[in-house]
Swiss-Prot record:
Residues 167-180 have a biased composition (Polar residues). InterPro entries: DEF8 (IPR051366), PH-like_dom_sf (IPR011993), PH_domain (IPR001849), PLEKHM3_PH_1 (IPR037812), RH_dom (IPR025258). It is found in: Cytoplasm; Golgi apparatus; Cell membrane. GO terms for molecular function: zinc ion binding. This is Pleckstrin homology domain-containing family M member 3. A zinc finger (Phorbol-ester/DAG-type) spans 656-709. SUPFAM superfamilies: PH domain-like. Keywords: Cell membrane, Cytoplasm, Golgi apparatus, Membrane, Metal-binding, Repeat, Zinc, Zinc-finger.
Amino acid sequence: MEALEVDDISPALEVTEDFFNSFDKLENGVHQSHVFGIHQVPEFLGNEISNKMKEQADGQNANTSQRSIIWERCKSSLFDAKTMNGIHAKEQNESTKRTYSDDPLLSEKEKGTSTFNLLRRLDRPHSVNDSLDHLEDAPKFKPGHNRSRSDVSHIDWKNIRKPAPLQRSSSQGMHCTSPFSEPRNKNMEANNEVRSSFTNILKKGFLETRITPESFWKGCYAEISQYELHIYGSDYSGNHNATDTYHLSHIESITITGSHETKLVNVIMTDDRYLQLKADSAWEAIDWGQKLWEAICALNLVPNYRSIHQDILKKQNNFSDGIRGCMENNVNKLTPSAMNISNGNQKNIIKTGTLYRLTIQSNWKAFTFVLSNSHFAAYQPSCLDEDPLLSYNIDACIAVQMDMLDGYDSCFQVIFPQDVLRLRTETRQRAQEWMDAIISAANSARKSDQSLLVPLRKKSKENQSVKDLQRSKRQSVTTSFLSLLTSLALERGLTAQSFKCAGCQRPIGLSNEKAKVCSYSGWYYCSTCHVDDGFIIPARLIHNWDTSKHKVSKQAKEFLEYVYEEPLIDVHQENPLLYRHVDALAHVVRLRQQLKSLRAYLFSCRAVVAEDLRRRIFPREYLFQQIHLYSLSDLQQVVEGKLAPFLLKIIKFATSHVYSCSLCSQKGFICEICNNGEILYPFEENSTSRCENCGAVFHSDCKVRTVPCPKCVRKELQKKQKSFWQQLDMDGSLDEACSMFELSYQST
């Protein structure tokens, strides 16, 4: 505490002290008779002394020593400041005023008492520094005291006054600490720090809330703590009082809706209560929803949740047994229930937050990362209920290290066998926290896996089934490799990989081992992870019909071998012009169209025939279901000329059945253009043609004529009104009749 300055002592106080010192001279001198009369003093000094004596006489029966000063500690959660108001307590009972007579026979006891009562006025603070000096010795305010502001020391509020405090209204009687709020000490000095310095306040600020979509918006001040969402309202005097408290364990779902300009946070409780929050901006609303979700997920990380609050109850020694029992019952009721989390990876969550990931385009993009005991997943912001965009097994993490290449001190790398994540946070401290959490989670996951594998007997490779081998291959498939299946990879350079192998993280390039580029992924590998294996690149085959084999890494070869027979390539969607430039592929698509037409006949016949067709084409049923869908094996067979003979063999079996079957042979068409009575079938593509709109079959020679499809004409005429039929000359030729109206379809 600073010492008193010279300017803080008023001249009136100095004169008053000189006046009080005169009593000491009277006590030390010889006792003799004195006549108390009127003394001549300056006018301003006389008024000051008379006022002091009058005020002292009014309160002489009150205990106005150091307990007469009551300090009110005001905390502001908005501006992180503390304001202290010095308030003098004025007692309710006024005593009878004393008067000094001219009688010289005053007892020495009464004189000493009067002198002591007057000298007690020196304890009043007359400046700001005086007020601060009395802080340590001043007793604390207790609820229920009657405060009087008629005797307040003057303080220059322009210099030290802060905005109105944001605090909860104190209730009368015993105040029970909420089991979900921060613990309080019996000594109120524990609350001297501002609320914003508490680590359990995750977010705070001003919002607008409403409890139903039809109600009006109300402005409020909100805080998210570790266990609760507090809503504060303002009264007429501007003070903020707690109006609602929502326990985070009772929140069932959190959704964010609205447009790009305005976002709303919708909160639904387990008891069907509804709360809607609106912030000043869309990003602020998203942040509120994110902080709520993080606080809910953090509840799963508190196994001794109930014992924490029982310890808080034990510290409150002044609670009665009845109140303590009530509080314990409330703790049992408010124990957080199991959260309804859609994704299994979100169980046992260790850490969540927003991180920035470096994309292929060398841009930093924000994602919501969730670290659990088994996975490290990335979600789209505000889309936490959906499936993760990226997901990695945490036990497969190879290394976690700082990344200082881009000039940021808050960048770090999380290295997995199939991918390298370059992440960035706002501060270096937060990056270090994420690194420590990932390393500890990976170590614990490896220890648990090793403990589980010890009692199990390892199977030999000879006894492993085909499904086990396929399952082991699926574990190596990643989203990054799958996205490059139909896209040409770009070489990003060794700098993007920090001059490390994408497989084993061994240093490569420059003076280290020679780097080898993978033609499929564009990543660089060492000579151990890249042994110059040759493979057809699907993207080069689709876009350039490049049938040559290129050098790929072991990872890429393993991935391509796994998806080799999977129908993942849609030629019509990726490059439809390929049918024009590659005759072999155009011939195959015609055969598949013919097989698709035969499928309709055989699947509408007896079940034995349909089962025979499935058996002949198994497991590639997509060949007659989606005619433009290919696997990498199919495209290689097209190049080698093996797919067309395979399809012709199946077509021969199906056509022989249709011609010989009494049921299927009756499902033919008659050319409505020539009407010669010959039965036509849609799979006879060499001699027939089919309407794209209605599916009618005609002769190929008849289709050359520019005559619209008669079946489509009939459908169009059925939609016309009666007035149209009166104008139509049905005796005329078909061309004249068709020319009288405009058809809404293309001519065949």
